[in-house]
A protein has these predicted regions:
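Conserved catalytic cores of very large enzyme subunits
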Residues: 1-184
Length: 184
């Protein structure tokens, strides 16, 4: 990818191809904010995009993640409302070196939830790896968005990190190691 738009678009296309090939089984979107932020910061610095453009790219990505659909049986639809496919976007927490993984794109993701035309929806499931040591501004913003939208779930970054280290990312049921399932 040469630009932030391309990085986001290619990540989405890769995710869409993967989730479609597994016929809707739960598949994490991942912890991508830090990856995207590298492209956003470079494009912002060079003047290719504005902060408004960066926010719009994330808004559009969230909307695209919400419109993924599968052909389901009536029995399946009777069990699960809203045709969920359990796409989890994980964010925040800390790296093994103690650096926060909160980025400007972490704020952009949460800001998308304030769009009046977006409304509530199951996808993407936004999971914040919470730690009391996260930046104060981010914790306050998480609290505000949680109160306003009820659209965020939280997991203890410290507990997950103690077991999975930096190899973790979030699945709807349990953390999983990249590249294969690890022995628990």
């Amino acid at each position: 990818a040469q630009t932030a738009q391309e990085a986001v678009q290619w990540t989405y296309m890769g995710y869409l191809a993967s989730v479609k090939s597994q016929d809707g089984a739960a598949m994490s979107f991942g912890r991508v904010s830090t990856f995207f932020d590298v492209y956003f910061e470079r494009d912002l610095k060079s003047g290719k995009i504005t902060e408004t453009d960066a926010q719009e790219i994330i808004d559009n990505l969230v909307m695209k993640l919400r419109i993924v659909r599968f052909l389901r049986t009536k029995d399946y639809d009777a069990i699960f409302s809203g045709d969920p496919y359990w796409a989890t976007w994980s964010d925040a927490g800390f790296g093994d070196d103690g650096r926060t993984l909160v980025t400007k794109t972490s704020f952009r993701l949460l800001d998308t939830l304030t769009l009046e035309h977006l409304g509530p929806g199951p996808e993407p499931n936004i999971t914040i790896f919470w730690d009391p040591k996260l930046p104060e501004a981010y914790k306050r913003f998480c609290a505000k968005i949680s109160i306003d939208t009820s659209a965020i779930q939280y997991e203890s970054d410290k507990e997950i990190r103690s077991h999975w280290a930096m190899r973790r990312h979030r699945m709807p049921a349990s953390p999983r190691m990249r590249g294969g399932q690890a022995d628990a």
